[in-house]
């Protein structure tokens, strides 16, 4: 997929996963690539492990609203599998879901009152929506890079393969957003995410 006149992103995760940092980097990348960009965030109970949702829109013309409607997302970037299922309806036909393989088990599941949905649910949702599903082992790749907290940058690396924006632009924007002492870690994490969907 390459950016047409407009590219819509929905990023979803759980508090503490770096969803908002990822959306800020994605917005910076769009601006650096010459797009008009709008972004919105819903923090929910982010500090307590609740859902975090961010919408980002790139457009070659003006973006008038940051909100991505249901069925309009070109890319759904999910930092956790159940969050991917909860927000799958935002994906449009021909879109791509980039999903971290991480599972954060909610209390209802750990208490035995519900079952955590398996990967087949994600695959079926993607097929039903006419979308593509890319599963990425974000935590494993981030750990191999040096720190599990870099999983958000691993996932951005995977997303970068879908877009016609140079790797140098991505890295420049990442470098502007992360502390200098973590630059090498994040370079490695980004490269491993790109390689995961090559």
Placement of each model-derived feature along the sequence:
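Active-site cofactor/cluster-binding pocket
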Residues: 1-198
């Amino acid at each position: 997929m390459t950016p047409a006149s407009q590219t819509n992103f929905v990023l979803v995760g759980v508090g503490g996963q770096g969803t908002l940092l990822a959306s800020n980097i994605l917005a910076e990348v769009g601006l650096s690539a010459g797009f008009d960009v709008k972004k919105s965030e819903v923090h929910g109970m982010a500090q307590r492990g609740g859902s975090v949702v961010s919408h980002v829109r790139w457009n070659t013309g003006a973006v008038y609203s940051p909100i991505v409607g249901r069925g309009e997302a070109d890319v759904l970037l999910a930092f956790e599998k159940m969050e991917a299922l909860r927000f799958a309806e935002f994906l449009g036909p021909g879109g791509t879901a980039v999903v971290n393989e991480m599972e954060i088990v909610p209390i209802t599941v750990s208490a035995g009152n519900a079952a955590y949905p398996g990967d087949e649910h994600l695959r079926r949702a993607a097929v039903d929506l006419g979308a593509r599903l890319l599963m990425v082992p974000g935590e494993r790749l981030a750990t191999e890079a040096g720190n599990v907290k870099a999983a958000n940058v691993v996932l951005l690396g995977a997303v970068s393969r879908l877009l016609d924006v140079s790797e140098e632009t991505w890295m420049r924007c990442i470098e502007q957003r992360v502390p200098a002492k973590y630059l090498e870690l994040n370079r490695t994490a980004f490269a491993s995410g790109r390689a995961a969907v090559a």
